[in-house]
Amino acid sequence: MGRGRVQLKRIENKINRQVTFSKRRAGLLKKAHEISVLCDAEVALVVFSHKGKLFEYSTDSCMEKILERYERYSYAERQLIAPESDVNTNWSMEYNRLKAKIELLERNQRHYLGEDLNAMSPKELQNLEQQLDTALKHIRTRKNQLMYESINELQRKEKAIQEQNSMLSKQIKEREKILRAQQEQWDQQNHGHNMPPPPPPQQHQIQHPYMLSHQPSPFLNMGGLYQEEDPMAMRRNELELTLEPVYNCNLGCFAA
């Protein structure tokens, strides 16, 4: 005897209705997953319970992409078949579409913050965990890249400073070598000629003409030695020559 056709109608018992909803929802999600895997199809499933809880499934967790694709396709089809009188209606639908998209983004944001997770199924929680893990991997990769670039920059600066220090040290050593060679050459010259080091340059002083005229002058001695005349002796001779006529003049006056 064949099985009779079951009549579809609302289940009056709340407990039975909730149990049936849970079983059928799980079966529906399973069928959506099977068709997406077997047929390589993009599937998006959205279910609201009688209490307003949302249950969804999407291929590879790309619900937003599938909905945007659906909206673009539906909007393009409506634009082709809709008359000009339906422009206001289209704007109203566009508003509702954007509003629904905003609500979806806000809900995803709450999920990313760890809020409002009670209404999510184990599959949805697993998808959310995968998304967070992927985001953490991207964050760690970017952080490591910035740290690596910072380390390379510091190493480059360190190398430049070391090269500059080496160049300055080499210049100092060369300068010390030159000064040491000059000092040794000067010491050898002083040792060979027994001469003191040259005095430092002095400023020229202006001398009185009298001092210039009474500089010691050389004279030739009878012995053949070249000597310089004593300036005091020259001064004394000049005084004697100057006083002798005066003394003679006085003697002549007394004699008269």
Curated annotation (Swiss-Prot):
InterPro entries: MADS-box/MEF2_TF, MEF2-like_N, TF_Kbox, TF_MADSbox, TF_MADSbox_sf. Keywords: Activator, Coiled coil, Developmental protein, Differentiation, DNA-binding, Flowering, Nucleus, Transcription, Transcription regulation. Its main location: nucleus. One of its GO terms (molecular function) is RNA polymerase II transcription regulatory region sequence-specific DNA binding. GO terms for biological process: cell differentiation; floral meristem determinacy; meristem structural organization; positive regulation of transcription by RNA polymerase II. Residues 1-61 form the MADS-box domain. This is Floral homeotic protein APETALA 1. It comes from Arabidopsis lyrata subsp. lyrata (Lyre-leaved rock-cress). The lineage of its organism: Eukaryota, Viridiplantae, Streptophyta, Embryophyta, Tracheophyta.
